């Protein structure tokens, strides 16, 4: 009864099953707020991440696929009522110079971050193409018996924010790679 929204998190450039999530949200009259921080450009059923729910939340942190040089992010919605409220809240809650309708705060992106993102947005398809090419190379050379990595389903278009593998002897592989000059990290 207290639940107001579902927040699917599209991790590593791979989208959640949005048909199931949206069906559940519709059944229980819940909002959907997509965490698309790691999935900019990813698609599910030929539709981009951040466009399925009431809101799409994106990060432009320097380590993301579409990044700026500082902390920033952006929000998407296709609902005009939501847009107007968010715009109001992001400008101190001020309707105009003299009327404050809600408590708010400044959350505008600075011009430098916006310009960098605008430039990189024009190159997003190249960035994604490069990441997908790298994934195919890794997958080809690591396609061994005991190395598992997520496959792309026919209705998905993954952008591979990270290349995730699962192996039985993780620590041994990580040490071997380190000795051979290859950095790895254990995520989540």
Question: At which residue positions do the language-model features occur?
Answer:
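Active-site phosphate-binding strand-loop segment of PLP-dependent enzymes
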Residues: 1-68, 74-76, 81
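PLP-dependent aminotransferase class I/II
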Residues: 5-9, 14-20, 27, 43, ...
């Amino acid at each position: 009864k207290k639940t107001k929204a579902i927040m699917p998190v599209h991790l590593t450039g791979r989208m959640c099953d949005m048909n199931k999530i949206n069906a559940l949200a519709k059944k229980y009259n819940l909002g959907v707020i997509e965490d698309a921080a790691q999935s900019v450009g990813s698609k599910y059923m030929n539709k981009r991440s951040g466009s399925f729910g009431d809101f799409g939340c994106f990060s432009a942190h320097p380590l993301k696929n579409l990044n700026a040089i500082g902390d920033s992010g952006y929000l998407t919605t296709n609902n005009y009522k939501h847009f107007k409220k968010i715009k109001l809240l992001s400008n101190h809650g001020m309707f105009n110079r003299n009327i404050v309708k809600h408590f708010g705060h400044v959350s505008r992106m600075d011009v430098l971050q916006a310009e960098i993102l605008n430039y990189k947005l024009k190159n997003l398809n190249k960035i994604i193409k490069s990441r997908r090419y790298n994934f195919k190379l890794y997958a080809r050379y690591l396609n061994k018996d005991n190395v598992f990595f997520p496959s792309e389903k026919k209705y998905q278009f993954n952008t591979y924010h990270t290349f995730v593998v699962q192996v039985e002897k993780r620590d041994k592989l990580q040490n071997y790679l380190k000795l051979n000059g290859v950095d790895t990290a254990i995520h989540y």
